[in-house]
A protein has these predicted regions:
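Short, solvent-exposed loop/turn segments at conserved positions within beta-propeller repeat blades
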Residues: 14-16
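Active-site-adjacent structural elements in enzyme catalytic domains
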Residues: 128, 146-163, 192-194, 209, ...
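Core segments of small alpha/beta cavity-forming domains
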Residues: 50-160
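Intrinsically disordered, low-complexity segments enriched in small/polar residues
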Residues: 7, 27, 38-47, 69, ...
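Low-complexity, intrinsically disordered terminal/linker segments enriched in charged
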Residues: 5, 20, 25, 29, ...
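Hydrophobic residues embedded in beta-strands of well-ordered beta-sheets
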Residues: 10, 30-31, 185, 215-216
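Surface-exposed, charged secondary-structure patches
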Residues: 1-11, 130, 153-194
Length: 251
């Protein structure tokens, strides 16, 4: 049963009934159910998770404002150790796409195609998006990308057939927070991965700097190792230069 709140009351707007193949209740307070599928079934996965134990209201609000807009899909910011000194593992192209939507409410205006599309994005456009949410200078952004200093553009290749991502990624959940003396926020985030029936697939500490005008920046992320953590197998890195040439050079 899918329930949404309306006028401070729960309203059921979808109902389904099925035989549970497996179920699990976690210490954290999640109930996971797996729908039975016959051998050979190739449809959508049947795992569903429900949080039974209520989550702190402030944690939910912080999650909605700072974490859910980025999430775990098509970027590695929440699954990578990074700060303003060590950031080489971040993929600025992934973050450009995600943060463009966060900033403007629409997708980047550069479409992928079967033959491997390639664009030259003006430096002001690319850097403005990244610098809105991350504390990096123009020089640092240029070092982590393919930047053409002659025409002041960034080479941008949308993801395509060969680096598309697994569709059933986890969703983030802020489980605790701390406001530091300098005004920054430290959020402890756990990944709830329904298809693996895990409520702590990845745990990390994300540092955020809220601004007076309501905007914010991500400052760093630290992955917390745990026996309950899983490999972030949903994330697909973009093609390397060699892989891109191998797959698209003849198109």
């Amino acid at each position: 049963c899918q329930v949404k709140w309306k006028d401070n009351s729960p309203q059921a707007n979808y109902y389904d009934e099925y035989e549970a193949y497996e179920w699990k209740y976690t210490e954290k307070g999640y109930l996971f159910l797996e729908e039975y599928h016959p051998p050979g079934f190739d449809g959508a996965p049947g795992e569903t998770g429900f949080r039974v134990q209520p989550l702190d209201k402030t944690c939910r609000e912080l999650n909605r404002k700072y974490v859910m807009p980025l999430g775990y899909a098509l970027n590695n910011l929440l699954i990578t150790n990074w700060d303003n000194q060590n950031y080489t593992e971040l993929d600025f192209y992934d973050l450009y796409e995600k943060m463009y939507y966060m900033k403007y409410g629409k997708q980047v205006p550069y479409e992928a195609n079967y033959g491997g599309a390639e664009y030259e994005v003006p430096e002001d456009e690319f850097e403005e998006v990244i610098k809105t949410y991350l504390p990096f200078s123009n020089t640092e952004i240029e070092k982590g990308t393919f930047y053409n200093s002659n025409n002041k553009t960034f080479r941008y290749r949308p993801r395509g057939l060969y680096d598309c991502e697994f569709p059933y990624e986890p969703y983030p959940e802020v489980i605790s927070y701390e406001k530091l003396q300098d005004g920054t926020l430290k959020l402890t985030i756990e990944a709830v991965w329904e298809i693996r029936m895990l409520d702590q697939a990845i745990t990390s500490e994300l540092m955020i700097k809220p601004m007076e005008d309501g905007s914010f920046q991500y400052l760093s992320n630290k992955v917390i190792k745990s026996d309950q953590n899983a490999n972030a197998g949903w994330y697909m890195p973009r093609l390397t230069e060699e892989e891109w040439e191998e797959n698209y050079s003849n198109n």
